[in-house]
Amino acid sequence: TELEAAVSVPRLVRGDIDLAIVLDWDNRPLSRPGGLCKAPLLEDLIDLAMPAGHPLADRPEVELREVAGEEWVSWPEGEFCHEWLMRTLRSEGIEPRVSHMAEEHHTQLALVAAGLGVAVTPRLGRGPVPQGVALVPVHHTLRRNIHAVWREDADRRPSIRAAVAALEKAAADITE
Protein backbone atom coordinates (compact mmCIF):
# COMPACT_ATOMS: atom_id res chain seq x y z
CA THR A 1 0.00 0.00 0.00
CA GLU A 2 1.38 3.40 -0.95
CA LEU A 3 0.81 5.97 1.80
CA GLU A 4 2.22 9.34 2.75
CA ALA A 5 4.48 9.25 5.83
CA ALA A 6 1.87 11.27 7.73
CA VAL A 7 -0.45 8.26 7.34
CA SER A 8 1.99 5.33 7.38
CA VAL A 9 3.91 6.31 10.54
CA PRO A 10 0.79 6.46 12.77
CA ARG A 11 -0.36 3.13 11.27
CA LEU A 12 3.05 1.70 12.07
CA VAL A 13 2.86 2.94 15.67
CA ARG A 14 -0.63 1.38 16.04
CA GLY A 15 0.63 -1.94 14.68
CA ASP A 16 -1.57 -1.84 11.57
CA ILE A 17 1.54 -2.30 9.42
CA ASP A 18 4.94 -3.81 10.22
CA LEU A 19 7.32 -1.77 8.09
CA ALA A 20 7.17 1.48 6.14
CA ILE A 21 9.40 3.11 3.58
CA VAL A 22 9.21 6.82 4.25
CA LEU A 23 10.64 10.01 2.81
CA ASP A 24 11.83 13.13 4.46
CA TRP A 25 13.33 16.20 2.88
CA ASP A 26 16.55 18.03 3.68
CA ASN A 27 14.93 20.90 5.58
CA ARG A 28 11.77 19.08 6.64
CA PRO A 29 12.80 15.91 8.52
CA LEU A 30 10.25 13.26 9.28
CA SER A 31 8.76 13.42 12.74
CA ARG A 32 9.47 10.00 14.22
CA PRO A 33 7.64 9.05 17.42
CA GLY A 34 9.51 7.11 20.10
CA GLY A 35 9.48 3.36 19.82
CA LEU A 36 10.45 3.27 16.16
CA CYS A 37 13.67 2.15 14.50
CA LYS A 38 14.93 3.76 11.31
CA ALA A 39 17.44 2.60 8.69
CA PRO A 40 18.58 5.09 6.05
CA LEU A 41 18.29 3.61 2.57
CA LEU A 42 18.91 6.27 -0.07
CA GLU A 43 19.61 9.92 -0.62
CA ASP A 44 17.70 11.18 -3.65
CA LEU A 45 18.97 14.38 -5.27
CA ILE A 46 16.46 16.86 -6.65
CA ASP A 47 16.85 18.86 -9.86
CA LEU A 48 15.15 21.98 -11.14
CA ALA A 49 12.95 21.29 -14.16
CA MET A 50 12.43 24.14 -16.61
CA PRO A 51 11.31 24.52 -20.22
CA ALA A 52 14.17 23.59 -22.56
CA GLY A 53 14.17 27.09 -24.05
CA HIS A 54 14.60 28.79 -20.68
CA PRO A 55 17.68 31.08 -20.54
CA LEU A 56 19.13 28.99 -17.67
CA ALA A 57 18.44 25.58 -19.25
CA ASP A 58 22.00 25.05 -20.51
CA ARG A 59 23.72 25.94 -17.25
CA PRO A 60 25.59 23.24 -15.29
CA GLU A 61 23.72 24.35 -12.15
CA VAL A 62 21.46 27.15 -10.93
CA GLU A 63 20.78 29.03 -7.73
CA LEU A 64 17.14 28.97 -6.66
CA ARG A 65 17.08 32.75 -6.44
CA GLU A 66 17.81 32.86 -10.19
CA VAL A 67 14.30 31.53 -10.80
CA ALA A 68 12.63 33.62 -8.09
CA GLY A 69 10.31 35.39 -10.52
CA GLU A 70 9.10 32.22 -12.24
CA GLU A 71 5.70 30.58 -11.98
CA TRP A 72 5.99 27.28 -10.09
CA VAL A 73 4.45 23.87 -10.55
CA SER A 74 4.03 22.22 -7.16
CA TRP A 75 2.34 19.38 -5.35
CA PRO A 76 -1.14 20.15 -3.95
CA GLU A 77 -1.38 22.37 -0.88
CA GLY A 78 -1.32 20.46 2.39
CA GLU A 79 1.00 17.77 1.05
CA PHE A 80 4.33 17.28 2.77
CA CYS A 81 6.18 17.89 -0.52
CA HIS A 82 4.35 21.16 -1.14
CA GLU A 83 5.18 22.40 2.35
CA TRP A 84 8.83 21.41 1.82
CA LEU A 85 8.98 23.34 -1.46
CA MET A 86 7.40 26.45 0.07
CA ARG A 87 9.80 26.31 3.03
CA THR A 88 12.80 25.77 0.74
CA LEU A 89 11.95 28.69 -1.52
CA ARG A 90 11.11 31.03 1.34
CA SER A 91 14.40 30.17 3.07
CA GLU A 92 16.07 31.57 -0.07
CA GLY A 93 14.00 34.76 0.16
CA ILE A 94 11.63 33.67 -2.61
CA GLU A 95 7.88 34.10 -2.27
CA PRO A 96 6.71 31.39 -4.68
CA ARG A 97 3.95 31.99 -7.20
CA VAL A 98 2.41 28.56 -7.65
CA SER A 99 0.41 28.53 -10.86
CA HIS A 100 -0.27 24.79 -11.18
CA MET A 101 -0.46 21.86 -8.78
CA ALA A 102 -0.11 18.19 -9.64
CA GLU A 103 0.47 15.14 -7.47
CA GLU A 104 2.56 13.11 -9.91
CA HIS A 105 6.05 14.01 -11.12
CA HIS A 106 5.28 13.12 -14.75
CA THR A 107 2.28 15.49 -14.69
CA GLN A 108 4.44 18.25 -13.22
CA LEU A 109 7.03 17.70 -15.95
CA ALA A 110 4.34 17.81 -18.65
CA LEU A 111 3.25 21.21 -17.30
CA VAL A 112 6.88 22.37 -17.39
CA ALA A 113 7.23 21.09 -20.98
CA ALA A 114 4.16 23.15 -21.89
CA GLY A 115 5.96 26.25 -20.61
CA LEU A 116 3.63 26.73 -17.64
CA GLY A 117 6.30 27.01 -14.97
CA VAL A 118 9.34 25.48 -13.32
CA ALA A 119 9.36 22.62 -10.82
CA VAL A 120 11.67 20.53 -8.71
CA THR A 121 11.83 16.81 -9.33
CA PRO A 122 13.66 13.97 -7.55
CA ARG A 123 15.98 11.81 -9.65
CA LEU A 124 14.92 8.38 -8.38
CA GLY A 125 11.82 7.00 -9.99
CA ARG A 126 11.48 10.04 -12.22
CA GLY A 127 10.88 8.10 -15.41
CA PRO A 128 11.40 9.49 -18.89
CA VAL A 129 11.73 13.26 -19.10
CA PRO A 130 9.37 14.77 -21.68
CA GLN A 131 10.81 16.52 -24.70
CA GLY A 132 10.98 20.22 -23.99
CA VAL A 133 12.14 19.87 -20.36
CA ALA A 134 15.65 20.67 -19.14
CA LEU A 135 16.82 19.34 -15.78
CA VAL A 136 19.46 21.40 -14.01
CA PRO A 137 21.05 20.63 -10.62
CA VAL A 138 20.54 23.24 -7.91
CA HIS A 139 23.78 24.79 -6.61
CA HIS A 140 22.95 24.15 -2.95
CA THR A 141 21.99 20.53 -3.41
CA LEU A 142 18.39 19.69 -2.64
CA ARG A 143 17.65 16.17 -1.48
CA ARG A 144 15.13 13.86 0.02
CA ASN A 145 16.04 10.91 2.21
CA ILE A 146 14.45 7.49 2.03
CA HIS A 147 14.28 5.35 5.17
CA ALA A 148 12.87 2.04 6.34
CA VAL A 149 10.98 2.45 9.62
CA TRP A 150 9.62 -0.24 11.96
CA ARG A 151 8.60 -0.67 15.59
CA GLU A 152 11.33 -1.36 18.16
CA ASP A 153 9.30 -4.25 19.57
CA ALA A 154 9.53 -5.95 16.15
CA ASP A 155 13.26 -5.37 15.76
CA ARG A 156 14.24 -8.97 16.49
CA ARG A 157 11.59 -10.55 14.26
CA PRO A 158 13.30 -12.48 11.46
CA SER A 159 10.83 -11.20 8.87
CA ILE A 160 11.55 -7.56 9.76
CA ARG A 161 15.33 -8.12 9.78
CA ALA A 162 15.11 -9.92 6.40
CA ALA A 163 12.95 -7.18 4.87
CA VAL A 164 15.25 -4.40 6.10
CA ALA A 165 18.33 -6.28 4.86
CA ALA A 166 16.70 -6.76 1.43
CA LEU A 167 15.82 -3.05 1.26
CA GLU A 168 19.37 -2.07 2.24
CA LYS A 169 20.80 -4.37 -0.44
CA ALA A 170 18.43 -3.02 -3.09
CA ALA A 171 19.35 0.54 -2.11
CA ALA A 172 23.06 -0.29 -2.31
CA ASP A 173 22.53 -1.82 -5.77
CA ILE A 174 20.83 1.38 -6.96
CA THR A 175 23.69 3.60 -5.81
CA GLU A 176 26.42 1.50 -7.43
Which role fits each region the language model picked out?
Residues 32-46, 50-72, 158:
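Flexible hinge/capping segments at coil-to-helix
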Residues 51, 75-76, 98, 121-122:
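Thr-Gly-centered strand-to-loop micro-motif
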Residues 15, 30-40, 44, 106-155:
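Beta-alpha-beta core module
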Residues 4, 63, 103-104, 122:
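Short loop/turn segments at beta->alpha junctions
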Residues 1-29, 95, 102:
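Central regulatory/effector-binding core of bacterial HTH transcription factors
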Residues 6-18, 86-92, 105-116:
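Short helices/loops that flank or line small-molecule/ion binding pockets
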Residues 23-29, 57, 70-92, 156-165, ...:
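Secondary-structure junction motif
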